[in-house]
């Protein structure tokens, strides 16, 4: 059954527009609360609510709290805390669920609601459908004796800081390193610099002055230019950039070069392989560069691809029992450290890997150079049989690449567009192949 409200990462949209309105979020909290009470055998469950730094977080938090307590659910509020921190505390405090109010890397005028189940894992499709089935039902507030309570927890950030530090090898530290940390004026603005400082690094913080309106604005993992400039200006060893909710990571070296999620995953995997740690393999996506796949296999590390989205990477990791995965966008999963993507913890694993290998980022990543890629967005009409139109040319291009490149055709889930991506060892091969396939789709061969 198709979901009506939940997307791949919870419920998200523009604030004030359905479904990110106070009345809908009130109903969402009430519906989720009803499902929790049913699954807890009629007991009074407890949920944790965290948020990022958007001005709308106050409004949406109040609506969620009202909905949950009306359904007979107790609520613990943390205030601003990264999404992976909410997942961790949901598990550590043995709560029935966790909720994060955030739109991740989006602009401040967007917001969203993301749920975690018991244990800090993402909700199953089945539970999301149960919640959706109750959203449109009439709200019937519990009798006063059954209403939930709401309270703020002290020290949530300190608990999360200690957890992050515990994932860094105990025989290593960060003394002697100068780091610039860009927290995108987001949920990690307070905790992230403290983690690196308490492990011994000299920390220069930027993007750490949230005002409710500046989250992700020309800063953070999606806008690394500010970090590049700060690293060069401060003559730092490395720069670390998170996104608004703290689950993405980009890094910059002392020369100002940016390293995306694929590069950082390779660094972590190579170090683990050299240390003899069995990670099983690495899960990337259909968009992961083929050169990285080849480089990993040269290190003796298996590789497979999932659909685009950290949710699908996580599914593959769990199915295969592998430990490392992620995307170029900076979502990195280290399953032996945390059960969700965590920008701070991922950065710590990269910094540990650099010490284990006794090399810098540039040296390690010189193992592979990304194959050139050409991406063309082709607009299509509703009902257009683009697969049939392109299949012959697609087969020709794949044959010509002779296993030294890849073709990915992907229909957009949000607009009438087919994304044509061709990757090859030579840029002109990629360009010509993508143009031929795009022409076949449009019928302009």
Curated annotation (Swiss-Prot):
Cofactor note: Binds 1 Mg(2+) ion per subunit.
Cofactor(s) listed: Mg(2+)
List of catalytic residues: 104 (phosphoserine intermediate)
One Gene Ontology molecular-function label: phosphomannomutase activity
Known EC number: 5.4.2.10
Modified residue annotations for Phosphoserine: 104
Pfam families referenced in this protein's UniProt entry, alphabetically: PGM_PMM_I (PF02878), PGM_PMM_II (PF02879), PGM_PMM_III (PF02880), PGM_PMM_IV (PF00408)
Annotated residues for binding of Mg(2+): 104, 243, 245, 247
Record GO cellular component, one term: cytosol
Top enzyme class: isomerase
Membrane-spanning segments: none
DNA-binding found in the keyword field: no
CDD domains: GlmM (cd05802)
HAMAP family in UniProt: GlmM_B
Protein name: Phosphoglucosamine mutase
Species whose genome carries this gene: Neisseria subflava
């Amino acid at each position: 059954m198709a979901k009506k409200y939940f997307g791949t990462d919870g419920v998200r949209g523009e604030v004030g527009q359905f479904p990110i309105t106070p009345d809908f979020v009130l109903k969402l909290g009430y519906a989720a609360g009803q499902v929790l009470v049913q699954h807890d055998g009629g007991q009074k469950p407890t949920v944790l609510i965290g948020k990022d730094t958007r001005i709308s977080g106050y409004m949406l938090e109040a609506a969620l709290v009202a909905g949950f307590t009306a359904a007979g659910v107790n609520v613990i509020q943390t205030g601003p805390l990264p999404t992976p921190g909410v997942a961790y505390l949901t598990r550590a405090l043995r709560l029935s669920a966790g909720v994060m109010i955030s739109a991740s890397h989006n602009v401040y005028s967007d917001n969203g609601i993301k749920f975690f189940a018991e244990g800090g894992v993402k909700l199953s499709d089945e539970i999301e459908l149960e919640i959706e089935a109750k959203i449109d039902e009439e709200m019937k507030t519990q009798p006063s004796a059954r209403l939930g309570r709401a309270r703020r927890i002290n020290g949530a950030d300190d608990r999360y800081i200690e957890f992050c530090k515990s994932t860094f090898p105990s025989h290593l530290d960060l003394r002697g390193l100068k780091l610039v940390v860009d927290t995108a004026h987001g949920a990690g603005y307070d905790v992230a610099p403290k983690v690196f400082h308490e492990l011994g690094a000299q920390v220069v913080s930027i993007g750490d002055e949230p005002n409710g309106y500046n989250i992700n604005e020309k800063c953070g993992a999606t806008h690394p230019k500010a970090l590049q400039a700060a690293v060069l200006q401060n003559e730092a060893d490395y720069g670390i950039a998170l996104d608004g909710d703290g689950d993405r990571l980009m890094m910059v070296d002392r020369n100002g070069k940016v390293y995306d999620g694929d590069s950082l995953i390779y660094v972590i995997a190579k170090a683990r392989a050299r240390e003899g740690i069995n990670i099983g393999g690495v899960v990337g996506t259909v968009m992961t560069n083929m050169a990285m796949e080849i480089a990993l296999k040269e290190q003796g590390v298996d590789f497979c691809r999932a659909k685009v989205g950290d949710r699908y990477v996580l599914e593959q990791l769990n199915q295969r029992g592998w430990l490392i995965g992620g995307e170029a966008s900076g979502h990195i999963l280290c399953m032996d450290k945390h059960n969700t993507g965590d920008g701070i913890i991922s950065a710590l694993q990269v910094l540990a890997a650099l010490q284990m290998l006794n090399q810098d980022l540039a040296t390690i990543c010189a193992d592979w150079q990304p194959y050139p890629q050409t991406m063309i967005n082709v607009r299509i009409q509703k009902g257009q049989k683009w697969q049939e139109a392109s299949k012959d040319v697609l087969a020709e291009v794949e044959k010509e690449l002779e296993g030294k490149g890849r073709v990915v055709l992907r229909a957009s889930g949000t607009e009438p567009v087919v994304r044509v991506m061709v990757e090859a060892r030579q840029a002109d091969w990629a360009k010509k192949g993508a143009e031929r396939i795009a022409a076949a789709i449009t019928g302009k061969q």
